[in-house]
C-alpha cells in the first residue's frame, strides 16, 4: 500500500514538473511577467537591506569609530600647517575667525608702515626668483605702499597662519578656564556617541524600509504562487487530455 501511494505521488509530481512545450511557454511567460520581475527586485532589495544592516552592526561601528579617531588640531603636530589651519577652523571657527581678522589687520598694518618707511621689496623678489610680471607690477604700480604691503602680506602667509593658530590656542584655553567654552569630551567618547546616534537613526529607517519591502514581497509572492498554480493546473489538465 505504501509503495502504491508513493508511486502515485511520484507520478503526479513528475506530471506537474515535466517540461513540455506548453509548460515551457508558460514558464517563460511567468518569468517575463511583471510579478516575476517584481519578485526578483524585492529579493535583491532584501539582500541589500540585509547587507546594509550588517554594515550598521556594532562591530562595524566600532571599526569605523576606531579608524576615525583624530587628535585635537590645536595639539596635533603630525599634520602640516595648512591641514592644521583647516581642521582648527572647522572645529574652533567661532574663536579662530576673530583671532585671524585681528592678526591679519596687525600684519597688514605693519607691512604698510614698513612700505611707507621705504622698504623696497623688488630686489628681494628678484633674488628669490619671482616671475617678472609680479616684479614689474610692483615696480611700475601706482598703488605704491598698498601693493607692496599686500605682497609682503602674502609672502608671510606661513608666519601668519602660525600666529593665528597660537592665538586661537591661547583664546580657547582662556575661554575654557573662565567657563565661556565647554571642554570637549575625549575624541573616542565623542565619536562613539555620534556613531550611536547615527546607528539609531539608520536602524529606524532600515526597519521601516524593511517592513515595507516585506509586505510588498509577501503580496508579490502570493500573486506569483497563484499564477504558478494556475499554470500547473493547466499543464496537468492538458496532460490528462493527452
Curated annotation (Swiss-Prot):
This is Uncharacterized protein C18orf19 homolog A. It comes from Danio rerio (Zebrafish). It is a single-pass membrane protein. Residues 198-236 have a biased composition (Basic and acidic residues). Disulfide bonds: none annotated. Gene3D superfamilies: 6.10.140.1430. It comes from the Eukaryota. Residues 57-67 have a biased composition (Polar residues). The keyword Membrane applies. It holds the Pfam family FAM210A-B_dom. Residues 76-188 form the DUF1279 domain. Residues 57-78, 198-242 are annotated as: Disordered. The chain crosses the membrane at residues 92-114. The keyword Transmembrane applies.
Amino acid at each position: 500500500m505504501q509503495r502504491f501511494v508513493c508511486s502515485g505521488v511520484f507520478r503526479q509530481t513528475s506530471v506537474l514538473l515535466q517540461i513540455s512545450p506548453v509548460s515551457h511557454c508558460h514558464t517563460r511567460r511567468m518569468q517575463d511577467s511583471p510579478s516575476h520581475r517584481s519578485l526578483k527586485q524585492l529579493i535583491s532589495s532584501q539582500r541589500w537591506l540585509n547587507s546594509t544592516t550588517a554594515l550598521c552592526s556594532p562591530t562595524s561601528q566600532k571599526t569605523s569609530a576606531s579608524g576615525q579617531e583624530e587628535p585635537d588640531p590645536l595639539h596635533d603636530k603630525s599634520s602640516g600647517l595648512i591641514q592644521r589651519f583647516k581642521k582648527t577652523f572647522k572645529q574652533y571657527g567661532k574663536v579662530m575667525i576673530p583671532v585671524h581678522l585681528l592678526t591679519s589687520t596687525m600684519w597688514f598694518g605693519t607691512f604698510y608702515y614698513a612700505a611707507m618707511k621705504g622698504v623696497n621689496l623688488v630686489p628681494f623678489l628678484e633674488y628669490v626668483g619671482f616671475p617678472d610680471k609680479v616684479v614689474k607690477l610692483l615696480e611700475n604700480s601706482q598703488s605704491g605702499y598698498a601693493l607692496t604691503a599686500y605682497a609682503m602680506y602674502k609672502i608671510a602667509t606661513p608666519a601668519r597662519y602660525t600666529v593665528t593658530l597660537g592665538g586661537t590656542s591661547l583664546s580657547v584655553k582662556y575661554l575654557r578656564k573662565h567657563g565661556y567654552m565647554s571642554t570637549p569630551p575625549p575624541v573616542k567618547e565623542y565619536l562613539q556617541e555620534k556613531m550611536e546616534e547615527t546607528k539609531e537613526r539608520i536602524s529606524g529607517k532600515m526597519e521601516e524600509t524593511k517592513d515595507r519591502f516585506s509586505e510588498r514581497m509577501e503580496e508579490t509572492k502570493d500573486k506569483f504562487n497563484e499564477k504558478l498554480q494556475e499554470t500547473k493546473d493547466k499543464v496537468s489538465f492538458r496532460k490528462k487530455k493527452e
